């Protein structure tokens, strides 16, 4: 692959904010803006997943240099659905909103709406063109993905001593004034990853433990004072090839009809290849199996094969197609949708 094409692709797939537009940089103060417009259509026999799914995502990242050792920073990101009526108040949501301080070689500490520690691992397989990353990660589900009330400490290269060894410590305050499946009590999480000093291979692991709320324990399914999860992952990223796998287990955490699963076992895998003319095919698999569910026993909660591809016109424009081949039984006890979905679209990002 030629170097210019590789640089474009890496910048796109790593993070939307990597190629943010710098709007201000003066006297130690810096402000970047980033965003994307995703024009997307779903095709499915499942009515709620059929039709226009377009949205706009926009955010900013700011920094201020306090002294040669200390930096303040903040980030905000929101999403606006374009398939809703203008009068629909649900068309906008805040994805991220946090502020913090970073001390050189010691690490960073921030508070707000952020990514949970468990997602540090699952992010490695959340790489499909549209779907993926949904075996155990769910928004506002303890510390599995984006969540509120997170105090997060992050340290890279382990205080400057071990290259490639990154550590996260996280605390989540209780959130009770919301839908019961989005609630959480006080909790703690941690994650660690190591790339063996900059090699093409990396491993990671995470653990979270949280109190559950009284209302959660009143549900028909899933009881227990604590919600617990652990995860591990590996990835290889070199020679135009990306391969990653993920495994996790949760206890009294994953929402199901009528409450929560007492236990889940989750697996994800993805393999992608980057052609030098811009095409990136993708093949993946996602499975979440619920265990010991009251009145059910064991049941697949998520089970699908994913086949997709992205074509990068340049660093700002891409087209994609993603086929979610659902493997759930049509007569599953929990009434989970078993229809396939095809997503097709164009993405402009900056």
From Swiss-Prot:
Superkingdom classification of source: Bacteria
PROSITE patterns listed in its UniProt record: GRAM_NEG_PORIN (PS00576)
GO MF terms, alphabetically ordered: porin activity
One cellular-component annotation, GO: cell outer membrane
Signal peptide: 1-20
InterPro entries found in the cross-reference section: Gram-neg_bact_OMP, Gram_neg_porin_domain, Porin_dom_sf, Porin_gammaproteobac, Porin_Gram-ve, Porin_Gram-ve_CS
Subcellular location: Cell outer membrane
Xref: Gene3D superfamilies: Porin
GO biological process: monoatomic ion transmembrane transport
Keywords: Cell outer membrane, Ion transport, Membrane, Porin, Signal, Stress response, Transmembrane, Transmembrane beta strand, Transport
Its membrane topology: Multi-pass membrane protein
Pfam families documented for this protein: Porin_1
Record's note on what induces expression: By phosphate starvation.
Keyword Kinase in record: no
SUPFAM superfamilies, per the entry: Porins
Presence of the UniProt keyword Transmembrane in the record: yes
PANTHER family: OUTER MEMBRANE PORIN PHOE, PROTEIN YDDL-RELATED
Free-text function comment from the UniProt entry: Uptake of inorganic phosphate, phosphorylated compounds, and some other negatively charged solutes.
Family affiliation: Belongs to the Gram-negative porin family.
Self-association and partners: Homotrimer.
Protein name, entry field: Outer membrane porin PhoE
Organism this protein belongs to: Salmonella typhimurium (strain LT2 / SGSC1412 / ATCC 700720)
Source taxonomy: Bacteria, Pseudomonadati, Pseudomonadota, Gammaproteobacteria, Enterobacterales
